[in-house]
UniProtKB/Swiss-Prot annotation:
Disulfide bonds: none annotated. The lineage of its organism: Bacteria, Pseudomonadati, Pseudomonadota, Alphaproteobacteria, Hyphomicrobiales. The active site is at E234. Transmembrane segments: none annotated. It comes from Rhizobium rhizogenes (strain K84 / ATCC BAA-868) (Agrobacterium radiobacter). It comes from the Bacteria. This is Pterin deaminase. One of its GO terms (biological process) is cytosine catabolic process.
Amino acid sequence: MSYSFMSPPNAARFVLSNATVPAVTVVGFTGPSSEGLMKADIVVADGLIKDILPAGTAPAELAKADMRDGMVWPTFADMHTHLDKGHIWERRANPDGSFMGALDAVRSDREANWSAADVRKRMEFSLRAAYAHGTSLIRTHLDSLAPQHRISFEVFSEVREAWKDKIALQAVALFPLDFMVDDAFFADLTTVVREAGGLLGGVTQMNPDIDAQLDKLIRAAAANGLDIDLHVDETEDREVLTLKAIAAAVLRNGFTGKVTAGHCCSLARQDENVAAATIDLVAKAGISIVALPMCNMYLQDRHPGRTPRWRGVTLLHELAAAGVPTAVASDNTRDPFYAYGDLDPVEVFREAVRILHLDHPLDTAARVVTTSPASILGRPDIGRIAVGGPADLVLFSARRWSEFLSRPQSDRVVLRKGKVIDRSLPDYRELDTVIGA
């Protein structure tokens, strides 16, 4: 196969010469940088990165793929997705694009259609797309109201095993915390999650019982050795701020597991003093935050006949400045919560730069879809170009940020263990058997 910008060698040992790499993703090499980009030769041997050298200094006897200053990134980490919901849009669209419309549409579709075969077909379709785009780590939230929790976690466990050599998968139980009032259900859900090696999650809502609910969730997580990943404050309502309650609960219970909060949209609607105090508490509690810029911009401040007044995203800059681990992710894909998307972290990154103003400078921006989410997910071996690490790399013709962010990079080349993979995307027609033609 030929590529317009480089010719990958068919050899066990070779060098990607004259590459441009985001410095924030590189381990074991430093050099002069401009806008956070360095020039390097990357030596690959037997599927591993053997060395990272100054550009133009690799041993002459090695087979070479001249990148001609094209970028080389590590494979991506997509830390907040919904593989169980993916691609149901054609079967159950959101009639008005609203958050409540999405909830109702998904509930109806789940109750009518989410058999094991249906979930597996759509989940694997999504993973094939993600793999082709260059992703090697995904965390998915799974709708976990009974009896769906047992159906979806069983399918997930099977799919995780089948895909373990391509994409590392993690799963989070997603359910309204109000349902913990049913002790039998919550005990069964916790057992299912523990046996599947998953995480406890849920949707937090402002109510008089929020502190007790969070205490119960955290104690269950601690007793079962589970981490927590929550859907938080996905609303424009400034009266809603459960993020502060979550941080207080983590500190109150002395929880030592990892806690992640996704969305946190209403934080951006708070007065400066309230926002700053909340961010300080989040930092003290050691909570990580993931923003979902495409889905948040799609859903938030949507009112018929009215132009949206805000972007829907959380205070990512302020959180990061306070030392809070932060990242961005895909969220929903072609379902009632987001009608578009393909689990492509390049698209997510490109849109995040625009929506969240991650540019000017872009020096460390690449971290939000590589090193940061991988670290939050407990996989520091992923999302990095590291000496001794796997040659899991994504090669681009783009040489500079302006080039990278101005086109979809559809001509990218993905290497896994130093070998070029087939980047053919699955045909949507394959879903006709479950979604309908």
